[in-house]
Amino acid sequence: MTIRHQGQQYRPRMAFLQKIEALVKDMQNPETGVRMQNQRVLVTSVPHAMTGGDVLQWIIQRLWISNLEAQNLGNFIVKYGYIYPLQDPKNLVLKPDSSLYRFQTPYFWPTQQWPAEDTDYAIYLAKRNIKKKGILEEYEKENYDFLNKKINYKWDFVIMQAKEQYRTGKERNKADRYALDCQEKAYWLVHRSPPGMNNVLDYGLDRVTNPNEVKKQTVTAVRKEIMYYQQALMRSTVKSSVSLGGIVKYSEQFSSNDAIMSGCLPSNPWITDDTQFWDLNAKLVEVPTKMRVERWAFNFSELIRDPKGRQSFQYFLKKEFSGENLGFWEACEDLKYGDQSKVKEKAEEIYKLFLAPGARRWINIDGKTMDITVKGLRHPHRYVLDAAQTHIYMLMKKDSYARYLKSPIYKEMLAKAIEPQETTKRSSTLPFMRRHLRSSPSPVILRQLEEEERAREAANTVDITQPGQHLAPSPHLAVYTGTCVPPSPSSPFSPSCRSPRKPFPSPSRFIRRPSIAICPSPIRVALEGSSGLEGKGEASWSGANPGPPVTESIETSVDRSRPHSQPRAPLKARAALSLGRFLRRGCLASPVFARLSPKCPSVSHGKVQPLGDMGQQLPRLKPKKVANFFQIKMEMPTDSGPCLMDSDDPGAGESGDQTTEKEVICPWESLAEGKAG
């Protein structure tokens, strides 16, 4: 059998096909090959056909392999088109039964690489279209229409060739015509795979050179070969026993750190779905694991490869006043593997910072290495600093690394290192008890989290104008949306926030932080102060004399200015109306909510005016229709925190009580602003 390879020289990644071809040629040997005979398919007798079971048995006996390996190799032979099925052409799998197969002619083997051009495929589709009278498969119809548009300029030639091949095929006998049709179909199934079928010949771009090509011997090539062998003779040779001993020692040293051989602590996140392993082994984790710190002592490359180890080593070098060595090494790594469009700028910066005479972080290297480096910087490239980087690397490895392992910094790091306990996988057969699977944390997300943490720390400033505010939480920080009285010791909620029908307060009521003092709301203080001015007596905030409720003050002030003929509005509606108007008339924008202090009440122009006396009151406004107003009077410690206020329903009772209720205006509002609100 004569086989000519016409296009394999530039496809070295397909070199394994030659081994398959050698095996296929042995299979076609008349004496030792696969048994072949004429087989009847439909109404045609096909010559040289064989069964899939015979092919599988021959591969097992010829190569001395298992049944599974032989099945896999047989599938490869069929998928690459060396054997094609007769009964099910689309199923390119070797069936170990009586299914019929046939050897492909060497002209259609993949190694021939005669170009499977669009013109040849168009001729094949046109011939099938003529033979099947327009009945093609869907993907063949799509390819036919696409090629008709693509090579429409020579479509007449395609139709003429298809008709000629169809007429020539009719002149052959029935068996040859059937065999040729099967061969063509098998070839195009491999080279123009249908949708959903794997294209086994998709190997990427063609290579320009062929590594298996026999090169012509020239004088230059012979000199290079002689030089190579001379250098090989000069190398120091090592016994195989010494090399194997080094490999065994390395394997024993790293066996405990091999996650596949020895497992990982606390557990493998891909098996147990526990992300604690990734959290404990983050790049710059605060406290590393003990196994990670112990690995730094294996060799210097393990230390400098780990970001956390490099950070600890940098801290040690700074104590020895030699931190510029590691800084120079990191700068060289950035030059080598960083953005190559900025090589020139980075090289100049490294020279000014580390190599120039009198540089701020000048490194100590020998004169010969310095001359080589400075000469190379005239035409900078990514490897221009390799000589200086190697010199500094060996200096740190032989001098600083040994002292680092004996330093208190490494010993303290090793003592503080954590050793996580092993966790077992929790499995459950119940679907609602299974844990949801999570993917591994993305490096992009981890980087974003680190940047957010740095930004959060940078933004955490201290307000020096408020002494003591940042040291502890405010002892009476509360959210007030209604009227409340001091709660009882047995309940964290105020009893006045409850109603007889509602034993528990709603979430929009008074909410107090646990274990803190009680802060009287500014509205209650104002109402108590106003009621005291009218003769009811000033109420104090204490447990012995809690004073009249706020609702009574509102009731009294409203009843005096209202005609007795009008019915009184409900208590809740009147309280909501007063609070709603209080919040809608710009009081929320007032500086009083920034910091309520008895020494600094707010005024209408938005500025803070200090008062000399605690009991000094603002001048009373005298509007025409105002019977009461809020006067902020707070008896609390000067270092107390702010009291927050919120409205339950700002719009409650707004439309129905406009005529029956008197306006309530804040003391920092003018009458015009109150009417405009």
Curated annotation (Swiss-Prot):
GO terms for cellular component: cytoplasm; glutamatergic synapse; neuron projection; plasma membrane; postsynaptic density membrane; presynaptic membrane. Pfam families: DEP, G-gamma, RGS, RGS_DHEX. It is found in: Membrane. Residues 530-571, 639-677 are annotated as: Disordered. Residues 30-105 form the DEP domain. Residues 219-280 form the G protein gamma domain. Expressed in the central nervous system. Isoform RGS9L is found in striatum, hypothalamus and nucleus accumbens while isoform RGS9S is expressed in retina and pineal gland. Residues 295-416 form the RGS domain. PROSITE patterns: DEP, RGS. Inhibits signal transduction by increasing the GTPase activity of G protein alpha subunits thereby driving them into their inactive GDP-bound form. Binds to GNAT1. Involved in phototransduction; key element in the recovery phase of visual transduction. PANTHER family: LP21163P, REGULATOR OF G-PROTEIN SIGNALING 9. Heterodimer with GNB5. Interacts with RGS7BP, leading to regulate the subcellular location of the heterodimer formed with GNB5. Component of the RGS9-1-Gbeta5 complex composed of RGS9 (RGS9-1), Gbeta5 (GNB5) and RGS9BP. Interacts with PDE6G and GNAT1. This is Regulator of G-protein signaling 9.
